[in-house]
Swiss-Prot record:
A zinc finger (RING-type) spans 85-129. GO terms for molecular function: ubiquitin-protein transferase activity; zinc ion binding. This is E3 ubiquitin-protein ligase RHA1B. InterPro entries: Znf_RING, Znf_RING/FYVE/PHD. GO terms for biological process: protein ubiquitination. It comes from the Eukaryota. Keywords: Metal-binding, Transferase, Ubl conjugation pathway, Zinc, Zinc-finger. The keyword Metal-binding applies. It is an enzyme of class 2 (transferase). Signal peptide: none annotated. It holds the Pfam family zf-RING_2. Transmembrane segments: none annotated.
């Protein structure tokens, strides 16, 4: 009932791997040539980079921040915020999409704050370092205190 000792039956044949590599190479070549012949790129380069697997999965904190801090237009703010985004140092324009942190009220371009959360893995305000997520929603899950996990371990023994 364990793993097979001979892993050859689990391997992908070499010709399949080489074919996939060639297809990927041609896809990248066509994408690189599209701008030179006046066509838009068919790959979305704003999506997660294939060379950076750490960006493939957003942290729970980043997902929660996305849900808890809505994106609004700068002109829709009721308060009198700062004149510029302290992350990119660009002045706010009335059409800018921004996020205003609920606890401290600081305002940032939504892309600047998203990069702060995702790329830097921060859950604090870039200015005052106040946490913008409730403490109970930003703590990691503790497998040791999970009743389900404990029951599963006991049932396998």
């Amino acid at each position: 009932m364990g793993l097979p000792t001979d892993f050859k039956e689990l391997q992908i044949p070499g010709y399949v791997l080489k074919t996939l590599y060639v297809i990927g190479f041609f896809r990248d070549m066509v994408d690189a040539l599209c701008p030179y012949i006046g066509l838009p790129s068919f790959l979305d380069h704003n999506e997660t980079s294939r060379s950076d697997p750490t960006r493939l999965a957003l942290s729970t904190s980043a997902t929660l921040a996305n849900e808890l801090i809505p994106v609004v237009r700068f002109s829709d703010l009721l308060t009198d915020p700062e004149d510029c985004c302290t992350v990119c140092l660009s002045d706010f324009v009335s059409d800018d999409k921004i996020r205003q942190l609920p606890k401290c009220g600081h305002v940032f371009h939504h892309r600047c704050l998203d990069r702060w959360i995702v790329d830097c893995n921060k859950i604090t305000c870039p200015i005052c370092r106040n946490r913008f997520l409730p403490e109970e929603k930003s703590t990691p899950f503790d497998w040791g205190t999970s009743d389900w996990f404990r029951d599963e371990v006991e049932s396998t023994n």
